[in-house]
Swiss-Prot record:
Residues 24-33 have a biased composition (Low complexity). Keywords: DNA-binding. This is DNA-binding protein MmarC6_0793. Belongs to the PDCD5 family. Gene3D superfamilies: PDCD5-like. One of its GO terms (molecular function) is DNA binding. GO terms for cellular component: cytosol. The lineage of its organism: Archaea, Methanobacteriati, Methanobacteriota, Methanomada group, Methanococci. SUPFAM superfamilies: Double-stranded DNA-binding domain (SSF46950). Residues 1-33 are annotated as: Disordered. It comes from Methanococcus maripaludis (strain C6 / ATCC BAA-1332). Residues 1-12 have a biased composition (Basic and acidic residues).
Length: 118
């Protein structure tokens, strides 16, 4: 398990705990928001190191259109960079190819309906 997965799991656990407590503890909510902001800042710092300027702007546009897909791409980029499997900085052309592969891996299977007439 890599550090990003551990942080993500810990963040989810804290969010679940905060939901259980509800709005009763504003200090815990503030602390959780602060930790989430730190996590986002750290993620953006890593992405700035990994991606070229063009690739970052492409990722920002994707984030506006498909936030969940962009989040998934960010996590995969960070994991690949930590494993040393990415050229740094990542060019826009390489990033486009990587996006195509990620999209192909995650696209839903096409369902076909066949109508047989008698």
């Amino acid at each position: 398990m890599n550090p990003e997965e551990i942080r993500q799991r810990r963040l989810q656990e804290m969010q679940a705990k905060a939901q259980e407590q509800g709005a009763q503890d504003p200090e815990a909510q503030r602390q959780m928001q602060e930790q989430q902001m730190q996590y986002e800042m750290q993620k953006q710092k890593i992405l700035r190191q990994i991606l070229s300027e063009e690739a970052r702007s492409r990722l920002a546009r994707i984030k506006l259109a498909k936030p969940q897909f962009a989040e998934q791409v960010e996590m995969q980029l960070i994991q690949l960079a930590q494993a040393g499997k990415l050229p740094i900085p990542l060019t826009d052309e390489y990033f486009k190819g990587l996006l195509d592969r990620i999209y192909e891996m995650n696209k839903p299977a096409k369902k076909e309906i066949t109508i047989m007439r008698r």
